[in-house]
């Protein structure tokens, strides 16, 4: 279970980006975080694994308080949080298998990593996961030879190779075409259920969020102002979350669906 309590993030002397935010996520739940640009969605995800340092508050994952960990302790604890990025964050010149095995770097020796002598169990699990997401036949292909959707599937498998206790996805479909975006969202939803893995997604496309999520969290100016099932996200709720956003921009992210 992830439990966030009174989480605040402030840059310098400006207004807080996150304002005493409280959120609990558990089980095989896919939670989509929506809101206009600047609402604090990406900052929230990055504060969870301390890619961004919280100013105050608590982030607890299955009994471990992340905000008080030392740098050394944090390096180890981050293995428990999988992360999927909008820009894929793959090494183009490496193969799919080599990129996937990057998810195990915190678990194997430096020598094994440098010589790419991966443990047999890791190779077996990598093939199982790649088969599950439909990229096993690309195992020996360079990452820069893949399409955007294929690259994002590599990113998902890399994160799952950590055997994480929670998966965070920061705008995982933002650079993909509509059909591929739906495939990735469907994949993340199915994996959450199959692996009993909580998944939190920062997403702009509200139509996809409503279709594939178990829960939607709406943010505005660093606060959570909506937290409920997709069916409860009415037009009035959308007007509150996206107040001030031009109608044409809402349409682009599916905010009127």
From Swiss-Prot:
Catalytic reaction(s) noted: phosphonate(out) + ATP + H2O = phosphonate(in) + ADP + phosphate + H(+)
Signal peptide: none
Stretches assigned to the ABC transporter domain: 2-246
Transport keyword on record: yes
Top-level class of the enzyme under EC nomenclature: translocase
InterPro entries on file: AAA+_ATPase, ABC_transporter-like_ATP-bd, ABC_transporter-like_CS, ABC_transpr_PhnC, MetN_ABC_transporter-like, P-loop_NTPase
Annotated positions binding ATP: 35-42
Quaternary context: The complex is composed of two ATP-binding proteins (PhnC), two transmembrane proteins (PhnE) and a solute-binding protein (PhnD).
The protein's name: Phosphonates import ATP-binding protein PhnC 1
Taxon lineage: Bacteria, Pseudomonadati, Pseudomonadota, Alphaproteobacteria, Rhodobacterales
Entry's Gene Ontology cellular component terms: plasma membrane
Pfam families: ABC_tran (PF00005)
Function: Part of the ABC transporter complex PhnCDE involved in phosphonates import. Responsible for energy coupling to the transport system.
Family: Belongs to the ABC transporter superfamily. Phosphonates importer (TC 3.A.1.9.1) family.
CDD domains: ABC_PhnC_transporter
